[in-house]
Amino acid sequence: MLKLNKLEKQTIRPAAEVDDVCAQLCSVAVQFEDAWERKDIEFAADLEGAAYTQADPGLLELVWTNLLSNAVKFTPQGGSITLRQTRANGKIYVSVTDTGCGMDEKTIKHIYDKFCQGDTSHSTEGNGLGMALVKRILELTGAEMQIESTPGKGSTFTVVLAERK
């Protein structure tokens, strides 16, 4: 909550540097290995390899951590999560796809609202600020988020970043 507040008031200024998104994703993903094993979640990573962008690496890591944490939280026992990173037309695409509870259009519209939790059955597992933080970080880095979701089937969150060669 403190980091979101500081980002909103711009007391934290992003320290942009050229960084490898693929390496970041690998580093963050391994932190969730125990969580996947506990829930018997099948995790797959399909990463194209080195992909460089200019952004604050610490802030981007918060985005990846939040997206993977939500995927683990909302994916049931025995489900699956796929982390994918591709490049095309000067852009880097990072997507997290899960077989979780999914969301309807109304929930998607409010996903970035502070204290909003789409599935209240998991309300004890978070404070509803994660996606508000993600939105602010993406605004500061010039990135965007695309969301596709089907209730009862799962969701895909795709972050689109400018590639830096």
Regions found by a protein language model. Name each.
Residues 15-19, 37, 42-52:
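Conserved catalytic submotifs in the C-terminal HATPase_c
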Residues 103-115, 135:
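Short conserved segment of the HATPase_c
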Residues 5-16:
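Helix-loop junction within the histidine kinase core
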Residues 71-72:
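Short helix-loop "hinge" at the ATP-lid/N-box region of the Bergerat-fold HATPase_c
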Residues 116-126:
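Glycine-rich ATP-lid/hinge loop adjacent to the conserved G-boxes
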Residues 34, 101-102:
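Glycine-rich G1-box
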